[in-house]
């Protein structure tokens, strides 16, 4: 199988790592544009990132130091209900009690006039630990290898995957000039005026959506929330 991935960055090299894990005998090529640098923002994940990391064989002690990574156990929201509102935590993992009927707890909170986010502070050790930049490693309900997300440098992470997990992946620094379709399928790519053919193509060019080549639809008239901000506790 011949696979081409258009676009590098964390999405491109995560795709390459995934395909290499699934199809170790495949010929995989990542095409990176010399004109488009990877987006150099910090990356924040939930605990579900672990599922992928386990699948491709990432070990925390190997990649985290190289990518300025820290563990994340909760998401902290400030001014979520009202301006100057008390911040609240959205912790990962399971609560420290078994609730057969959590709806009873929420109804009780409502009748008392208390906010629902008090639920997390009362029943998740992780919520309190996050306020103090601690990990609840002694909590039997907390699993380090399951209940943590990450913060990391996205550019360093992409480079680490490229250099440590994708040594057998071919890398082309070039521009995709055009591509040819046969029906709904892409048949050829033209990269720096040279023709390339693959069995499977991945578009990792972000909003450019180079291979999809479809019209951008504006939904701002329907989506009234145009901004989002949060503090992430780690």
Language-model segments: which ranges?
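Dinucleotide-binding Rossmann-like beta1-alpha1 core, especially the glycine-rich loop
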Residues: 41-131
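Short hydrophobic core segments
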Residues: 197-206
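Short beta-strand to alpha-helix junction loop
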Residues: 144-162
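Single conserved hydrophobic/aromatic residue that forms the stacking wall/gate
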Residues: 224-234
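A conserved short coil-to-beta-strand element within the FAD-binding core of flavoproteins
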Residues: 173-185
């Amino acid at each position: 199988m011949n696979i081409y991935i258009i676009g590098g960055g964390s999405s491109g090299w995560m795709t390459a790592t995934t395909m290499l894990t699934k199809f170790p005998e495949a010929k995989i090529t990542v095409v990176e544009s010399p004109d488009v640098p990877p987006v150099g923002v910090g990356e924040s994940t939930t605990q579900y990132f672990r599922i992928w990391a386990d699948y491709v064989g990432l070990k925390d002690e190997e990649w985290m130091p190289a990518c300025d990574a820290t563990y994340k156990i909760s998401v902290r929201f400030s001014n979520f209900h009202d301006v100057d509102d008390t911040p609240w935590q959205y912790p990962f993992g399971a609560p420290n009690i078994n609730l057969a009927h959590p709806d009873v707890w929420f109804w009780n909170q409502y009748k008392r006039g208390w906010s629902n986010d008090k639920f997390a502070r009362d029943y998740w050790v992780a919520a309190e630990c996050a306020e103090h930049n601690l990990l609840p490693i002694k909590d039997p309900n907390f699993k380090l290898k399951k209940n943590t997300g990450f913060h990391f440098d996205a550019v360093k992470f992409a480079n680490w995957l490229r250099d440590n997990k994708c040594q057998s992946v071919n890398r082309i620094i070039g521009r995709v000039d055009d591509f040819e379709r046969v029906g709904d399928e892409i048949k050829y790519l033209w990269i720096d005026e040279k023709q390339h053919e693959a069995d499977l193509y991945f578009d990792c060019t972000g909003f450019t959506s180079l291979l999809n080549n479809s019209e951008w639809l504006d939904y701002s008239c329907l989506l009234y929330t145009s901004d989002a901000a949060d503090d992430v506790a780690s």
